[in-house]
């Protein structure tokens, strides 16, 4: 039987608040004129849990094809959903899997600012449904609400035709620029927005396409939100890891693929190996 061995990585076993460090931003004067980029998808992963503690869910909403993974911590099973969204209303249906062929429906109203999701879960045995109140899994007070504006350049030598080179972080409450992220060359079609270190604050993830890299290389640029400075800061430690971070908030684990699984525990990032 496999046992899990927690191996503290010298370069990575640091406080979660120290994942990031300040890296000077590139001044606009040092770069070419950048043009606004529209249609950039913000892939936001919301991690929510039910009030009674039975369910944990990773929810991707506000995109063309909203989807979710619902973990039933009592019955120890996972249900994947896909569906539609109109305004704040989500209507999701389960996707068949090897684990289960049962059909489930999950519908409800999502508050995009607070992360509260009032939902109704139904199946063949319970067509009336069970009311579930979801809330952020990692709650913090005064969490900022941001939106983004994107800028870049056309690049005929790049396989994507252009590159993302600047992100303006806009405070949604007063429509002011809270921060400008620069000094990078990124994939121009989408960014990730997720709580990578499970501290309750969302972080920014961009696919690095500098120096001939492509999306398939799975190299990423990380900006971790620091609530003390109220700024996003680059994380060279995370940027050394190859692989797309797959977050398992119910276990506080990050899976980068190829056996690279890290546990966030007591403010430390530890690598898990199986033997």
PLM region descriptions:
Residues 1-5:
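Positively charged n-region of N-terminal signal peptides that target proteins for export
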């Amino acid at each position: 039987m496999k046992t899990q061995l927690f191996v503290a990585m010298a370069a990575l076993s640091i406080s979660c608040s120290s994942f990031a460090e300040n890296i000077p931003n590139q001044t606009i004067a040092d770069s070419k004129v950048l043009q606004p980029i529209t249609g950039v998808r913000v892939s936001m992963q919301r991690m929510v849990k039910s009030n009674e503690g039975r369910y944990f869910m990773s929810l991707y909403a506000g995109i063309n094809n909203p989807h979710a993974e619902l973990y039933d911590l009592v019955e120890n099973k996972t249900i994947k959903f896909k569906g539609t969204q109109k305004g704040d209303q989500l209507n999701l249906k389960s996707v068949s899997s090897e684990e289960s062929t049962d059909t489930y429906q999950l519908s409800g109203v999502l508050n995009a600012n607070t992360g509260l999701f009032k939902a109704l879960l139904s199946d063949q045995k319970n067509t009336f449904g069970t009311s579930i109140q979801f809330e952020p899994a990692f709650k913090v007070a005064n969490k900022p609400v941001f939106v983004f504006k994107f800028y870049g350049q056309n690049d005929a030598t790049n396989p994507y035709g252009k590159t993302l080179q600047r992100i303006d972080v806009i405070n949604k409450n007063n429509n002011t620029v809270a921060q400008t992220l620069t000094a990078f060359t990124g994939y121009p079609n989408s960014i990730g927005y997720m709580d990578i270190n499970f501290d309750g604050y969302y972080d920014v993830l961009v696919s690095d396409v500098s120096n001939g890299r492509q999306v398939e290389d799975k190299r990423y640029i990380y900006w971790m939100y620091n609530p003390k400075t109220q700024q996003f800061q680059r994380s060279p430690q995370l940027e050394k890891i190859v692989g797309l971070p797959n977050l398992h908030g119910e276990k506080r684990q990050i899976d980068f693929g190829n056996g690279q699984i890290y546990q966030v525990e007591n403010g430390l990032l530890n690598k898990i190996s199986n033997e």
